[in-house]
């Protein structure tokens, strides 16, 4: 469960950070034809949640952790554990013990949900896919409200590292309201939020920093159609324990894709990230 990643001394604290309407309107697409979808389900910890996890989710100690990322920001008032169904390799169906959106609770980030429960064992009956079984609604912040019921996605196995699953441009003018973490410096011309399948840190358990900034490669497209690969001028939205980074760009050229090389960031299970690539969206939540 990569969202729970922390430095060794603060690991349990970050774990705890993860625990903490109207009649449904069914739709399959929003106003720009973006489908409602589960983007990822990441089997991050197998029977490994610490005892302190019981503080915000009684009975969580020793259970599994699985962050899932959705295509749109959701209405937290419609979020219930019964909305999710985890199906194991053998076909067994499991409902989470509890769910939480912590710590990815900034505006625009409300699309990552941590599932806590018993979802099978990595060695003999691992989780195979996650399905939305209830009426989990988007918040309608940038499109009409849609229902995720029926969406499903294959589970990334326990021994695989986290990948980028979403990238979107966000308005520089809204930057201060978009994050509780560190901010981009003054004067940036474009900001891209990237979302990982779960929280990531350096192999030494420290927060990502300038070295990781230089590893991010953003392809931008100029007005004449030419493209260039650049590194962000700064890396922001750090020190808040979630699975999002802000890439602060000092160019007005439009960001079209983001790459990050394999082997530099890890999840709580110690699995290194693979080489990962994601196209940049227009900021639709």
Residue ranges with predicted function:
Residues 12-23:
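Bacterial N-terminal signal peptides
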Residues 2-3, 20, 27:
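Intrinsic disorder/low-complexity signature
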């Amino acid at each position: 469960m990569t969202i729970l990643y922390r430095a060794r001394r603060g690991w349990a604290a970050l774990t705890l950070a993860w625990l903490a309407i109207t009649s449904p309107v069914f739709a399959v697409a929003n106003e720009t034809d973006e489908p409602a979808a589960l983007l990822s389900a990441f089997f991050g910890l197998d029977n490994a949640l610490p005892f302190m996890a019981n503080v915000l989710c009684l009975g969580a100690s020793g259970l599994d952790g699985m962050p899932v990322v959705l295509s749109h920001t959701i209405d937290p008032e419609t979020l219930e554990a019964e909305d999710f169904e985890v199906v194991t390799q053998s076909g067994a169906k499991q409902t989470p013990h509890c769910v939480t959106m912590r710590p990815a609770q900034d505006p625009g980030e409300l699309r990552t949900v941590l599932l806590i429960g018993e979802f099978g064992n990595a060695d003999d009956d691992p989780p195979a896919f996650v399905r939305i079984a209830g009426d989990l609604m988007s918040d309608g912040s940038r499109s009409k409200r849609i229902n995720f019921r029926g969406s499903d996605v294959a589970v990334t196995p326990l021994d695989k590292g986290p990948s980028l699953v979403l990238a979107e441009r966000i308005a520089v003018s809204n930057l201060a309201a978009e994050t509780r973490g560190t901010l981009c410096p003054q004067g940036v011309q474009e900001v891209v939020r990237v979302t990982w399948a779960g929280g990531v840190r350096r192999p030494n358990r420290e927060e990502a920093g300038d070295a990781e900034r230089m590893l991010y490669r953003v392809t931008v497209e100029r007005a004449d159609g030419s493209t260039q690969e650049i590194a962000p001028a700064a890396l922001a939205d750090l020190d808040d324990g979630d699975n999002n980074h802000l890439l602060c760009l000092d160019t007005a050229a439009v960001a079209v894709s983001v790459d990050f090389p394999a082997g530099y960031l890890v999840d709580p299970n110690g699995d290194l990230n693979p080489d990962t690539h994601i196209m940049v969206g227009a900021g639709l939540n």
